[in-house]
Amino acid sequence: MTDSAKPQNPDPGHESRRVAPLAGSPRSPFLIEFPEDSFTAVFLGREKRFLVEAERNGHLFQAHCNNSGSMLGLLRPGSDILLSVSPNPSRRLPYTLESIKLGSHWVGVNTLVPNRILRLAWDRGILPELIGYDRFQNEKTSGESRLDAFAEGPAGQVWIEAKNVTLVEDDVACFPDAVTVRGQKHMRELTALARAGRRAACFFLVQRPDASCFAPADFIDPVYAELFHAAVHAGVEIWPYEAVVTRQGIALGRRLKVVGH
């Protein structure tokens, strides 16, 4: 039994600097860099929805998992995982699950990453879809939904929702990996914006390297898939991008084609 209130230091004798994942320097290929105090451990199980059990150097401890999806195909006991250390010394669980090793590559599971990558890519000017937008706002309310981003500038205005993708089936990156009522709501709002003549987009960050294209997971959430197709028909833009996830950090990779619509 592990102690969830006072997790043991998985690396005895090591004093953590408690630095959260950082924005990469302008010369770095990474948009997000993991600090030196991030560390690997062995995944043991998912105790609760937002809690994972891990082991390092013979010590059992718990870590926070902000991914509410099923993470289908990733939660294999014995797999290596990468954990970051919270800069908040009073947080009950100081460690956050960032990625899981699947075979020879890492899969990013932190659902806050797509929003950060979107903004950092805009800031560096490396996302073609956001060229001509010189103002960027995280989280903006539209109708009854709060969307992840809003950008405006000489090119106009664009509303954006960002999603994390970890599921790949037969070389196809698929979203979602579990039924998502919240995701359905966001897609409806994007569709309403597009039908009102506004530019709207959904940014899907595929945090693994083994997909050649992207499609909605109709075999998991047929309602979301139907809404996805209706959104595309209404003019909502789909931006699926591969993330290059390593032990050191995360970079923005190639854009994937959308299939099945």
Swiss-Prot record:
Pfam families cross-referenced by the UniProt entry: SfsA (PF03749), SfsA_N (PF17746)
Region: Disordered, residue numbers: 1-23
Any one Gene Ontology molecular-function term assigned to this protein's record: DNA binding
CDD domains assigned to the protein according to its UniProt record, in alphabetical order: SfsA-like_bacterial
InterPro entries attached to this UniProt entry: SfsA (IPR005224), SfsA_C (IPR040452), SfsA_N (IPR041465)
Top-rank taxon, per record: Bacteria
PANTHER family: SUGAR FERMENTATION STIMULATION PROTEIN A
Family affiliation: Belongs to the SfsA family.
Name this protein carries in UniProt: Sugar fermentation stimulation protein homolog
Organism, scientific name: Syntrophobacter fumaroxidans (strain DSM 10017 / MPOB)
Lineage of source species: Bacteria, Pseudomonadati, Thermodesulfobacteriota, Syntrophobacteria, Syntrophobacterales
